[in-house]
């Protein structure tokens, strides 16, 4: 399995890091077979899997449950788990308790925190305690209410300079990688050049050190409306819907189960009492 050292070496070697979200064992298993370098159990599961309209309602219990499933499905892949909304903004003791659950109970290999200079001290204390941390700057979904919605960050020079300062603060605090979301490609390239740890982009251009996308967006699974930065490589929803509709039709018409899908008995006593044939 790859490690934090591996990812830093990949940056030095110029090998892009392929990161993908997963929220359950079957998805994680397929991601591992496909050769994904790193799996993110994102709090995006709130919207993608749990039916919420934001990431805010997602709990530590949710993240523990889904991380366990992902680790069972992809035991040989490095797994990063999101710290949910407001789970790392109070006392460090409380933050450490949440991190302990995600690493020890759920089996995550690292945690991801949203924020820059404002959370650098927390990141520093976590990394000093031996916790691998991934940072997340730019468009931070947990803060969309403050940011004014899902919009591109860092377009103005002042915003870009702040994001550079955020990335520098996270690197100095010990983060081994930083996710940069929804920023101009020029800023994504600058961050990859100026920061010594991997910059993993999502809507940050092609010159970052890696890319991350949501599993369901990549395969076109219930993702009719996607962000500009998403490329859908297939569309499984119509195939799934067609299969389910065919199943319903077969049941209604008694076309399923067929003989190939049924069991039988040749016990003459049973047949004498209850009837039926021996086929």
Swiss-Prot record:
Pathway: Cofactor biosynthesis; (R)-pantothenate biosynthesis; (R)-pantoate from 3-methyl-2-oxobutanoate: step 1/2
Sequence intervals crossing the membrane: none
Cofactor note: Binds 1 Mg(2+) ion per subunit.
Key word Metal-binding present: yes
Active-site residues from the entry: 181 (proton acceptor)
Biological process according to GO: pantothenate biosynthetic process
Gene3D superfamilies recorded: Phosphoenolpyruvate-binding domains (3.20.20.60)
PANTHER family on file: 3-METHYL-2-OXOBUTANOATE HYDROXYMETHYLTRANSFERASE
Protein name from the UniProt record: 3-methyl-2-oxobutanoate hydroxymethyltransferase
Record GO cellular component, one term: cytoplasm
């Amino acid at each position: 399995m790859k490690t934090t050292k591996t990812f830093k070496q990949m940056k030095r070697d110029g090998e892009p890091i392929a990161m993908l979200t997963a929220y359950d064992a079957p998805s994680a298993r397929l991601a591992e077979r496909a050769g994904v370098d790193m799996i993110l159990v994102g709090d995006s599961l709130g919207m993608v899997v749990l039916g919420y309209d934001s990431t805010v309602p997602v709990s530590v219990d949710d993240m523990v449950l889904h991380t366990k499933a992902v680790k069972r499905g992809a035991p040989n892949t490095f797994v990063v788990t999101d710290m949910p909304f407001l789970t790392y903004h109070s006392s460090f003791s409380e933050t450490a308790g949440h991190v302990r659950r995600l690493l020890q109970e759920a089996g995550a290999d690292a945690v991801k925190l949203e924020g820059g200079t404002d959370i650098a001290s927390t990141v520093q204390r976590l990394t000093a305690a031996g916790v691998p941390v991934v940072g997340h700057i730019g468009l931070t979904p947990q803060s969309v209410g403050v940011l004014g919605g899902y919009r591109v960050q860092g377009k103005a020079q002042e915003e870009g300079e702040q994001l550079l300062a955020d990335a520098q603060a996270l690197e100095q605090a010990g983060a081994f990688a930083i996710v940069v979301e929804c920023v101009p490609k020029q800023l994504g390239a600058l961050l990859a050049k100026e920061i010594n740890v991997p910059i993993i982009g999502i809507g940050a251009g092609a010159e970052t050190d890696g890319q991350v996308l949501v599993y369901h967006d990549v395969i076109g699974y219930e993702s009719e409306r996607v962000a500009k930065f998403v490329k859908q490589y297939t569309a499984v929803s119509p195939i799934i819907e067609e299969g389910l509709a065919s199943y319903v039709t077969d049941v209604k018409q008694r076309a399923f189960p067929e003989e190939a899908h049924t069991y039988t008995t040749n016990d003459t006593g049973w047949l004498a009492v209850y009837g039926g044939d021996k086929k």
